[in-house]
Amino acid sequence: MGIVVLGAVFVDIKGYPSDVYIPGGRNAGRVEQVHGGVSRNLVEDIANVELRPTFISLVDNTGIGADVIRKLQDHKVNTDYIRAVPDGMGTWLAVFDNGGDVVASISKRPDLRPILITLDEHGDEIFRDADSIALEIDCDKEIVKKVFYLAEKYGKPVFAAVSNMSIAVERRDFLRSCHCFVCNQQEAGILFSEDYTGKTPEELRDILAHHIQAAEISRMVVTMGEQGAVYATHDGQSGICPAIKVDVKDTTGAGDAFFAGVTIGLTYGKSILEACEIGTRLSASVICTSENVCPRFLPSEFGLEPGSACGDQLTLEL
């Protein structure tokens, strides 16, 4: 079944100015609507490395929902566990400046509780055959608890990302049970109640190494934009993964692609540095296009062997 991804589908509405962006003023430009959401982007990124993931999610029972499923199927994603329900998708509205960075955004999250029905009915068959699990840690708490229960039952590693750190902080105890947690510099500051603005990669690497020991987090990666990413593990490894310099067109989905690369690498036997390097390549391929996801790659381009899943999982305390 490969990597199993669990989370929400969003419709992204993105506005781009045709001239210099004027904050608080009227800006002529273009507006695009695309399929998005951290988990939806993640599962398509994994599929674009020809790894045949499975997606547990919800869509609206509308034509847009059907289009989401059709596109994922075209990319060889297993969509058997996507349920169509009223108001099953979220919406993300974002405005970009001329440099491709988000200057304002607002989002409406969907109600993901129907996913619990899927986990109750099919959780055993899904988790038994999975190579690993990837989810947004800020999902409904009952969903997160069910995921970690099934992961422990079948000995599967869980990789966690975040879309709303304020909610994710309430799930902080689950991070000890994650195989690896990935977030950005600002989110790491919220997690550890500190301000990391202006920190160098070397400084943040050392801070992260200290905090994950104290918090008993197995592995953690923090992205720092153009400064790359830093990582640390509970067994004492830490380091910096430099960014790849590319022309920035649209940063949407770059973090999701990075998380996909880390998940892919650690699932299929790579070191944490090698996994970060895969994430960096996928992220760079997203930034230089207007797409939310990476282009097609072959597993061999990253030295991957999909038959060699890591399969270890920490003991959980629910």
Regions found by a protein language model. Give the residues of each.
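Glycine-rich phosphate/adenosyl-contacting loop at the front of the ribokinase-like
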Residues: 1-74, 248, 314-318
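Conserved phosphate-binding/catalytic region of the ribokinase-like
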Residues: 3-4, 194, 198-318
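Short glycine/proline- and charge-enriched loop/turn segments
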Residues: 20-28, 184, 239-243
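A glycine-rich helix N-cap at a beta->alpha junction
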Residues: 71-86
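Conserved phosphate-binding/catalytic loop of the ribokinase/pfkB sugar-kinase fold
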Residues: 84, 94-132, 137
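Structural alpha-helical scaffold elements that stabilize or flank donor/cofactor-binding regions
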Residues: 125-126, 173-174, 213
